Amino acid sequence: MTAQLTQELPEFPTWLNARPSTLQEHRGRALVLAFVNASSVWCAERLAELAHWQARSPGRLQVIVVQVPRFDSEREPQRALKQLRGHGVSAPILLDRDWETWRRFGIESWPTLVLLDAYGRERQRLVGVTGDLDKALVALCEGQQLPSDADLHEVAERDPEPRLELRFPTGLAATEDRLYIADTGHHRVLECTHGGRVLRQFGHGNADFIDGGVGEAAFRRPQGLALERDQLYVADTGNHALRRINLRSGQVDTLCGTGRSGEPVEGPLAFAGASALHYPQGLAVADNQVLIAMAGDNRIWSYDLGRAALSARAGTGALEIRDGSGHLAAFAQPAGLAAVQQVAYVCDGLGSSIRTMQLRGDLVQTLVGGQGTWQFGDEDGPRGTARLQFPQAIALATDSPMLWIADTGNGRLRCLRLGGGELTTVLLPRRLHGPAGLAVAAGAVWIAETDAHAVLRYDLASGELRDVSIEE
């Protein structure tokens, strides 16, 4: 395309983690305007690619993230900031609350990257997750001056997240005396007592993709957990891999995944890297299979532990909501999973819905929500009228008909009695901050309060909600 000076940003934008600035001020170095949505895993992937490129080429590229809300909760500055920081974003973020910047630049879908050269001229647009980003950025930065000392020392984020024992925890698993936490922002998995004392740490805390013992292994933004006897299965989301922790030996190994996103391949795997995965997020174990909510390709997959084989169970791959059998059904970024008695329960995040999949026949049906990918709300009641907003986690005990739901966008814990019950909100003393992980065990619902960097315990008998103080 012919290079031309680009539009300026709106006059009074909302900056979430940086001082207000104009595009004019950023001239002198190449700049990417990244139009994204914080709830989209495709956007999270593009942002991770940009951050990786900046780390490899310090001082050469500036990035401004333009957050365009899909959900009502994302219009709240603090919630939008937390979501993006949860993806590891530290670049300046502009909240385009009413889509003004989106319209000004003529954006049609997210993620869209608008590439501006050092003179403020638009050179290219990359739409979606296809296209050679590395090649485009190399060409964009070609010929510009070497970065100065000031360029190499980027301005620190305004009001950074506090340094706490946990950072954006997500997946949980629990037994009668143990609690397992995916400490996502610290790239590790913790084994704790119910009181919060850390017994073991799996993953040394630096983002990497390494198998090995307790002090050697490494994860990258792990999320979903599923426990089966002495094996803990981990959705190593940032590495696009399915990992396994042997709780007797502490050994971590990779069952499937290459460390990079890609199209999964059905069939037996000769070795772990024989098939890529695409943003695995939720896990459940049933019938010697690890069920995988593959948020990046909008399908439910399974990994056969006996045959070391991958199978696509349900979903077309299109981001839609449609009931039906197996590959006739469609999901909208499935996130959380639970399974019991030959049924898998799925949190369909962008569909703001709860779906079921029969493990015999793979028939998919909608329990709550499912009216469309832009239909959401905060409403209890019969299944046909109840509403959720971007639910991310689901849990149930094997001996109870109660389904527990982390209604992430609404900051609520919801429950649904199986067999015809209505959706109800659990009365808590306060609204939760981005809950994105659940487990049920030992008379309690364990909640990963992700945006607050905390884990909570909700006592089923007394209704008491308290913090689990994590102590290393």
What are the roles of these predicted feature ranges?
Residues 174-176, 227-229, 285-288, 339-341, ...:
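Residue-level detector of Asp-centered blade-edge/turn motifs that repeat once per structural unit
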Residues 100, 111-126:
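A short, hydrophobic beta-strand/beta-hairpin element that forms part of a small beta-sheet core
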Residues 81-109:
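Short, internal strand/loop/helix patches
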Residues 181-185, 234-238, 278, 292-296, ...:
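Conserved beta-strand positions in repeat-built beta-propeller and related beta-rich domains
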